[in-house]
């Protein structure tokens, strides 16, 4: 496994995965995964479905417990006690495949609810923050629409705004475009690119290779729960060293 020059090498690691193992019964979902995410970096996790990418993401904020190794957040091991784990989750925004919006709340209230219920922010201040975030993702005009009145791409942009409302240190994206119609994928990727340009630390599980190639600072290739290769996108997409990486990208028709 070759490591190319890392643009963010001088930055402190925000998340470190150290020989992480995760088992589901006898099935090994993660098999000795060692990677790190530096501050201000976009790290994309790619590879075939079922290779452990989403599992690693869920281990980052203790939605899943690990069976070996360590996950360090700002140098501190991820807590196993649920109350402390919740505090860690508050520092991370997570965007899921299927939006996970409250269907009975409009877009504005979906974004405002976290700061009110978790951070104890006043409703007025939370709604003011929520409106600014909806403006940021291009949906101020849809603030009073319910999820049923929004397209998939619009719902996912609301979900991104909701995650940002908690002012996270890290944003985790679990295949954020996989449930979208092709014509709405671009609007979500554009919001994510804007966050990257602003210096948000991001870990992204994605099948959007063009996004990974153009936006990521570091790309990690998974197969059968293992990291088969990691490096800058120029290495992964133009000069991969692992045969499995070449096979995977070739299967997708990626030609650099």
Task: Report each predicted region and the residues it spans.
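Pre-NBD coupling/linker segments of ABC/ABC-like ATPases
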Residues: 1-9
């Amino acid at each position: 496994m070759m490591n190319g020059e890392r643009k963010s090498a001088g930055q402190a690691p925000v998340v470190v995965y150290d020989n992480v193992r995760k088992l589901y019964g006898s099935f090994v979902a993660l098999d000795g995964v060692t990677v790190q995410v530096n501050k201000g970096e976009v790290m994309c996790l790619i590879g075939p479905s079922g290779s452990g990418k989403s599992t690693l993401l869920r281990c980052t904020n203790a939605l899943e417990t690990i069976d070996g190794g360590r996950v360090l957040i700002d140098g501190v091991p991820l807590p196993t006690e649920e109350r402390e784990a919740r505090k860690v989750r508050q520092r991370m925004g997570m965007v899921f495949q299927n939006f996970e919006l409250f269907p009975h709340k409009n877009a504005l209230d979906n974004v405002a609810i976290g700061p009110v219920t978790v951070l104890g922010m006043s409703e007025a201040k939370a709604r003011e923050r929520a409106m600014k975030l909806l403006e940021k993702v291009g949906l101020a005009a849809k603030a009073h629409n319910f999820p049923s009145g929004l397209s998939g791409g619009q719902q996912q942009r609301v979900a991104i705004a909701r995650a940002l409302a908690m002012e996270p240190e890290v944003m985790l994206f679990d295949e954020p475009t996989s449930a979208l119609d092709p014509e709405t994928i671009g609007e979500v990727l554009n919001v994510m690119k804007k966050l990257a340009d602003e210096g948000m630390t991001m870990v992204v599980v994605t099948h959007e290779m063009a996004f990974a190639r153009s936006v990521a600072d570091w790309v990690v290739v998974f197969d059968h729960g293992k990291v088969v290769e990691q490096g800058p996108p120029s290495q992964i997409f133009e000069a991969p060293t692992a045969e499995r990486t070449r096979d995977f990208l070739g299967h997708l028709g990626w030609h650099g």
